[in-house]
């Protein structure tokens, strides 16, 4: 990846992140009248990355490609069984975990977290909202079999079978895409299969079409 220092609005503060270097998959700087047609290809990010940056560019077209992450920094579990003080959950195949001294940790290339924030999804109502996190008040974790975990709690709310929890660190050190001091930009038929700690941010730019 290209590693370039950028200060981006609403990302993690200088106090928490003294080195705001971005790790960039597709980096366009001071270019004019360039079209990149992915013809349906997928740009697969590994680790915490900013998928693309357009800096001081004009007349740029990015089109017909997908952006995805090998191991998204937002992890996911589905509730298979629930008791008063425990959950049994199915871990999504793209979510990596490790258990050390009965403590659960999520990780990927260059990142890890044990706490963070969560949102939950109800399949029946098709509603998603910010919620209690399955990492809160967690006493111990046991792997029943690969990608199926027993989570025991000091206390927990009732959550409901087949509730899906998505968890992430609240640390925003990268964005999904960044357009800076540019104009006349067209983002056409780009599928973001995962938006990381932030979406696409445009700063000091004009005439952006998506």
Protein language model annotation of sequence segments:
Residues 19, 37-47, 65-76, 120, ...:
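Beta-strand-rich solenoid/repeat architectures in extracellular/passenger domains
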Residues 66-68, 95-133, 156-182, 190:
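Extended Gly/Ser/Thr-rich low-complexity repeat segments
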Residues 2-35, 44-63, 71-87, 170-183, ...:
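Extracellular beta-strand-rich solenoid/capping regions of secreted or surface-exposed proteins
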Residues 148-157, 193, 198-201:
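Charge-rich, low-hydrophobicity low-complexity segments
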Residues 85-93, 139-156:
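Generic recognition of long tandem-repeat/solenoid scaffolds
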